[in-house]
């Protein structure tokens, strides 16, 4: 078909035509795909929430698929309007034995709250999850750890709603109740335990980082940030305006590189817990300056203080009440809370659903106010 000289030349000079053909094919598909996206639209469209002045990178980008998707746990949320007392009704503390919290409620409202708690925490087991298999005469006994823990969690919930209004109701009345964390589960998701050191072959700082763990958000950052910053009132600030700082790292006034990495680990955890980026709270031009932060920074600061109090005053002291299978895998420590325990990846838990409107009994440590 071809001249002999042409066939001989091809035989003497073999050329791989498949490589260029594949390259041209890939480039052609890429050009076609780009043209289709421009003409039809990006299938993974995003929207940006502006958090500061234009042109400064102050925005939080979200995929519309995520932004418009409802929190699937909202559909299962149980609520019931309170029964307005008419006055003169017998109170729960006078009817039942060993009612240490919620004793000032009427019988109807007391049982209404108890019913809700079973739906929020143990919908399959119901009352027996805390009170056991006995009859009503045995409900006053504290034989099960679940009842002892539930009592303390009611007190914690009341404290949060009453004393941390600046965080839980920062933008509107939202509040918290048992379902905010539990979402129908016996044990809330996104609790955490101490796990450091994460290696046995090293000691010192190397033993708490460079291992992907849930507490490091699967990064090489330190895994002890929650342990340091969410159980103790340790200062988080590590920024210094000096290029060279006189002093010895780990002195009170001198932050070490390790502490800086712990801060990054904590901030990364914050971002993942709320599904946001750094400039949701910080100003892109001056991360270090509270005077230039967004309003969300103050809300987050209060949230951190609130979580520390929750862990110190309510959760960690319950360690002796839990059975072995409820304690941490490394140190047998009590389960602890953090931002994601409530937020579950959303800026607002349950996307801002008001979960306290029907439950004034959980909004205060005093007698509830019915409206």
Swiss-Prot record:
<feature type="binding site" description="axial binding residue">
    <location>
        <position position="343"/>
    </location>
    <ligand>
        <name>heme 4</name>
    </ligand>
</feature>
<feature type="binding site" description="axial binding residue">
    <location>
        <position position="167"/>
    </location>
    <ligand>
        <name>heme 4</name>
    </ligand>
</feature>
<dbReference type="GO" id="GO:0019684">
    <property type="term" value="P:photosynthesis, light reaction"/>
</dbReference>
<feature type="binding site" description="axial binding residue">
    <location>
        <position position="131"/>
    </location>
    <ligand>
        <name>heme 1</name>
    </ligand>
</feature>
<keyword id="KW-0479">Metal-binding</keyword>
<dbReference type="GO" id="GO:0042717">
    <property type="term" value="C:plasma membrane-derived chromatophore membrane"/>
</dbReference>
<feature type="binding site" description="axial binding residue">
    <location>
        <position position="282"/>
    </location>
    <ligand>
        <name>heme 3</name>
    </ligand>
</feature>
<dbReference type="Pfam" id="PF02276">
    <property type="entry name" value="CytoC_RC"/>
</dbReference>
<dbReference type="GO" id="GO:0020037">
    <property type="term" value="F:heme binding"/>
</dbReference>
<dbReference type="InterPro" id="IPR003158">
    <property type="entry name" value="Photosyn_RC_cyt_c-su"/>
</dbReference>
<keyword id="KW-0349">Heme</keyword>
<feature type="binding site" description="covalent">
    <location>
        <position position="339"/>
    </location>
    <ligand>
        <name>heme 4</name>
    </ligand>
</feature>
<keyword id="KW-0249">Electron transport</keyword>
<feature type="binding site" description="covalent">
    <location>
        <position position="181"/>
    </location>
    <ligand>
        <name>heme 2</name>
    </ligand>
</feature>
<feature type="binding site" description="axial binding residue">
    <location>
        <position position="114"/>
    </location>
    <ligand>
        <name>heme 1</name>
    </ligand>
</feature>
<keyword id="KW-0472">Membrane</keyword>
<keyword id="KW-0674">Reaction center</keyword>
<dbReference type="InterPro" id="IPR023119">
    <property type="entry name" value="Multihaem_cyt_PRC_cyt_su-like"/>
</dbReference>
<feature type="binding site" description="covalent">
    <location>
        <position position="281"/>
    </location>
    <ligand>
        <name>heme 3</name>
    </ligand>
</feature>
<feature type="binding site" description="covalent">
    <location>
        <position position="130"/>
    </location>
    <ligand>
        <name>heme 1</name>
    </ligand>
</feature>
<feature type="binding site" description="covalent">
    <location>
        <position position="127"/>
    </location>
    <ligand>
        <name>heme 1</name>
    </ligand>
</feature>
<protein>
    <recommendedName>
        <fullName>Photosynthetic reaction center cytochrome c subunit</fullName>
    </recommendedName>
</protein>
<comment type="subunit">
    <text>Component of the photosynthetic reaction center composed of protein subunits L (PufL), M (PufM), H (PuhA) and cytochrome C (PufC). The reaction center interacts with light-harvesting antenna complex LH1.</text>
</comment>
<keyword id="KW-0602">Photosynthesis</keyword>
<keyword id="KW-0813">Transport</keyword>
<feature type="binding site" description="covalent">
    <location>
        <position position="278"/>
    </location>
    <ligand>
        <name>heme 3</name>
    </ligand>
</feature>
<comment type="function">
    <text>The reaction center of purple bacteria contains a tightly bound cytochrome molecule which re-reduces the photo oxidized primary electron donor.</text>
</comment>
<feature type="binding site" description="axial binding residue">
    <location>
        <position position="267"/>
    </location>
    <ligand>
        <name>heme 3</name>
    </ligand>
</feature>
<dbReference type="GO" id="GO:0005506">
    <property type="term" value="F:iron ion binding"/>
</dbReference>
<feature type="binding site" description="axial binding residue">
    <location>
        <position position="153"/>
    </location>
    <ligand>
        <name>heme 2</name>
    </ligand>
</feature>
<feature type="binding site" description="axial binding residue">
    <location>
        <position position="182"/>
    </location>
    <ligand>
        <name>heme 2</name>
    </ligand>
</feature>
<dbReference type="GO" id="GO:0009055">
    <property type="term" value="F:electron transfer activity"/>
</dbReference>
<feature type="binding site" description="covalent">
    <location>
        <position position="178"/>
    </location>
    <ligand>
        <name>heme 2</name>
    </ligand>
</feature>
<keyword id="KW-0408">Iron</keyword>
<feature type="binding site" description="covalent">
    <location>
        <position position="342"/>
    </location>
    <ligand>
        <name>heme 4</name>
    </ligand>
</feature>
<dbReference type="GO" id="GO:0030077">
    <property type="term" value="C:plasma membrane light-harvesting complex"/>
</dbReference>
<keyword id="KW-0677">Repeat</keyword>
<dbReference type="InterPro" id="IPR036280">
    <property type="entry name" value="Multihaem_cyt_sf"/>
</dbReference>
């Amino acid at each position: 078909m071809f001249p002999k000289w042409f066939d001989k030349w091809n035989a003497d000079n073999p050329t791989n035509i498949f490589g260029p053909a594949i390259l041209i094919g890939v480039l052609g598909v890429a050009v076609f795909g780009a043209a289709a996206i421009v003409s039809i639209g990006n299938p993974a469209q995003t929207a940006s929430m502006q958090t500061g002045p234009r042109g400064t990178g102050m925005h939080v980008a979200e995929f519309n698929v995520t932004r418009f998707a409802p929190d699937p746990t909202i559909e299962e949320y149980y609520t019931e309007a309170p029964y307005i007392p008419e006055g003169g009704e017998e109170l729960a503390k006078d009817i039942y034995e060993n009612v240490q919290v919620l004793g000032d409620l009427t019988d109807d409202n007391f049982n209404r709250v108890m019913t809700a708690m079973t739906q929020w925490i143990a919908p399959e087991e119901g009352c027996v999850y805390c009170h056991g298999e006995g009859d009503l005469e045995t409900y006053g006994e504290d034989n099960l750890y679940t009842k002892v823990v539930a009592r303390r969690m009611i007190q914690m919930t009341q404290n949060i709603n009453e004393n941390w209004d600046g965080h839980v109701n920062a933008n509107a009345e939202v509040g918290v109740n048992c379902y905010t964390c539990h979402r129908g589960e016996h044990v809330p998701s996104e609790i955490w335990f101490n796990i450091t050191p994460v290696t046995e072959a090293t000691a010192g700082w190397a033993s708490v980082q460079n291992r992907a763990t849930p507490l490091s958000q699967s990064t090489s950052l330190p895994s002890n940030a929650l342990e340091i910053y969410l159980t103790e009132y340790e200062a988080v600030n590590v920024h210094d305006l000096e290029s060279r700082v006189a002093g010895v790292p780990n002195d009170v006034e001198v932050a070490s590189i390790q502490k800086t990495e712990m801060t990054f680990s904590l901030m990364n955890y914050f971002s993942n817990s709320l599904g946001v980026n750094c400039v949701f709270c910080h100003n892109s031009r001056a991360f270090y300056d509270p005077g230039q932060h967004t309003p969300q920074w103050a809300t987050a600061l209060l949230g951190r203080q609130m979580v520390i109090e929750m862990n110190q005053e309510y959760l960690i002291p319950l360690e002796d009440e839990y059975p072995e299978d409820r304690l941490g895998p490394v140190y047998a420590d009590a389960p602890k809370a953090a931002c994601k325990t409530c937020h579950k990846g959303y800026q607002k838990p349950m996307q801002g659903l008001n979960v306290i409107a029907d439950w004034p009994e959980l909004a205060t440590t005093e007698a509830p106010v019915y409206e």
